[in-house]
Amino acid sequence: MFISEIQLKNYRNYEDLNLSFEDKVNVIIGENAQGKTNLMEAIYVLAMAKSHRTSNDRELIRWDEDYGKIKGRLQKRNSSVSLELNISKKGKKAKLNELEQQKLSQYIGEMNVVMFAPEDLNLVKGSPQVRRRFLDMELGQIAPVYLYELSQYQKVLTQRNHLLKAMQGKNEETMLDVFTLQLIEHGTKILQKRFEFLHLLQEWAAPIHRGISRGLEELEIVYKPSVDVSESMDLSKIKEVYYESFQSVKQREIFRGTTLIGPHRDDLQFFVNSKNVQVFGSQGQQRTTALSLKLAEIELIYAEVKEYPILLLDDVLSELDDYRQSHLLNTIQGKVQTFVTTTSVDGIEHETLKKAKTIHVKSGTVDCEIDRI
């Protein structure tokens, strides 16, 4: 799949922009704070209905405006699809082929993207929240039911936490048990989907990592749940373990006023040659692991939806050494529509970029003619 055009209205620093793209490589060039990343983010938001940079949708709307709009044309193997996302203070409304979607979960997944930004290099050494977000965003694209279960889980979690904060000195345990059972119902389904996804991701990421490391390293991805469950357990057993675990931490949760276990507390670990790369890995190994995961995402999405996703490389090439840079560009060459942001193409010598369409951005406008590198 590839996006052939995009329209932005009151989005970030773009007042009104219409732009067409090549189906292979598009390089967006400009100085910092001119709008390169905003343009890249707009493509991501069009696909995912949320930003990778902020959870506050108001920040996506141009200053002093009441609404923002992103509209794009997606070309797929057997169809052409119009996507539109309208953002206001009241929330977001999505359209597919001009038809408004009742739920965002019905919209997400139509256009698949893989974002690789400098913060993704922190996937290994960053906080557990970074890794959970990675899981949620990628899984949500290929499994709409996961997004539904996740949104329901988060609603119940918020209600349960409010109750826990208010419980000290009050007898509200009956209501707490109701929320606990609801949390277990949605949480176990989330857990199962994560186990399935990571099994597939492992199958793709391990050989990719082996290739980048010239056969010297073996990558293993391990899911670390906050309760003592495993992939081999069936759904009823997982629910049973969750229930027992919630009973054992109930008084601590009431004392602390928050939910202490569940998928929102889980984590991932990455092992290279049986060593925890987060703790013992070099910066090079950590970056190879992050790169392997991103390249594996591309192949996994293709295996699931039979279309390659759109790859967004936001100021990340300069963060990779020449070898990893070349491996990345060689892998995607000719098969994945790719967007690259950079302040300059100097020092990036690769055939893929020489054939790219370049877009020069300055102060929220496409400042000059589109040309070739």
Curated annotation (Swiss-Prot):
Q: Name one GO cellular component term.
A: cytoplasm
Q: Where does this protein have coiled-coil stretches? A: none
Q: Which GO terms describe its molecular function?
A: ATP binding; single-stranded DNA binding
Q: Where does ATP bind?
A: 30-37
Which top-rank group of organisms is this from? Bacteria
Q: Per the UniProt entry, what are the Gene Ontology biological process annotations, in alphabetical order? A: DNA replication; DNA synthesis involved in DNA repair; double-strand break repair; SOS response
Could you identify this protein by its name? DNA replication and repair protein RecF
